[in-house]
C-alpha cells in the first residue's frame, strides 16, 4: 500500500470538493459543474476514481450528467457532490451536501455530525457495527432517518468497493474489526423519508466486471477502450458520448451489461421521495486513531 499516494489523492479530493462547493450556485448547470470538477482533478495531477455524482434532493446517489443534460441548480436544492480521485489506483472518496444559495440546516448537520461521530470511534480493533451505531444515533436524534441500504465501503487499489461495508445503522452481526492499514470510505446519508433507496432509470454510470463474448463489433471496441482507460473503476456514459452514434452507444452498453461484462449503476432515489443529505471522508485505520485523507 502506498500511503503517500493515498494522502496525496485525499489532498486533491479535499481541494476539489471545496472549490466545487463555491461553484454550486443557482442557475449553474450540472453538466458544467461536472466538467469543471473532473477537469480540475486532472489539472491537479490525478484522475477521477469515478464520475462525479451530482445528486439533487430525493436522488441519493449515482446521478452524473450526460452531454445534453440541461438540469440546472435552483435555490434551496440539496446537492450532494460525491468526488473520487485516484493516483495510480490509490483512491480518495469524499462527499459534501450543499443547500444551493442557502445556509446549512438540520438535515445537513445530521449527516455531517454522523460522519464526525463515526470517525471519532474508528481505530484498529473496533467492530464496524460501532460505526453504524454512531451514525444512526446522530441522525435519529435529530428526527431524521439513516438510509439503511446505502453504506460506506472498504477501498483497495483500483477497487472502490472492496467487499466490506460500513452500514448507516447498527447491525449486531457486523463483527468485522477494523485493522491497521485498512482504507474505508465512511458516508452517512440522512433523509426526511423512510430511510431506503430504490433504483430508478436512467443508468449513467457503469463499471467493467469481466470479459464476455459479444457479437456486436461496436460493443467489442467499447469494451477494449473501457478496460484500457478505466480498468475496474466506474465510468460515465458521458465519457463515451461521441465515440459512436448515440443509438449504437446505448445498444453497445446494453449488450455489454446483459453479457455480464459491465455492471450498471442505476440512479438511486429515496423510496418516499424524501430529501437526502450525505457527507463522506476516506480514512486509513491506525492502531489508536485514523488518518482522514480527505479532511
Swiss-Prot record:
Binds 2 divalent metal cations per subunit. Has a high-affinity and a low affinity metal-binding site. The true nature of the physiological cofactor is under debate. The enzyme is active with cobalt, zinc, manganese or divalent iron ions. Most likely, methionine aminopeptidases function as mononuclear Fe(2+)-metalloproteases under physiological conditions, and the catalytically relevant metal-binding site has been assigned to the histidine-containing high-affinity site. Transmembrane segments: none annotated. Substrate binds at residues 62, 161. A divalent metal cation 1 binds at residues 82, 93, 280. PROSITE patterns: MAP_2. GO terms for molecular function: initiator methionyl aminopeptidase activity; metal ion binding; metalloaminopeptidase activity. Monomer. Removes the N-terminal methionine from nascent proteins. The N-terminal methionine is often cleaved when the second residue in the primary sequence is small and uncharged (Met-Ala-, Cys, Gly, Pro, Ser, Thr, or Val). This is Methionine aminopeptidase.
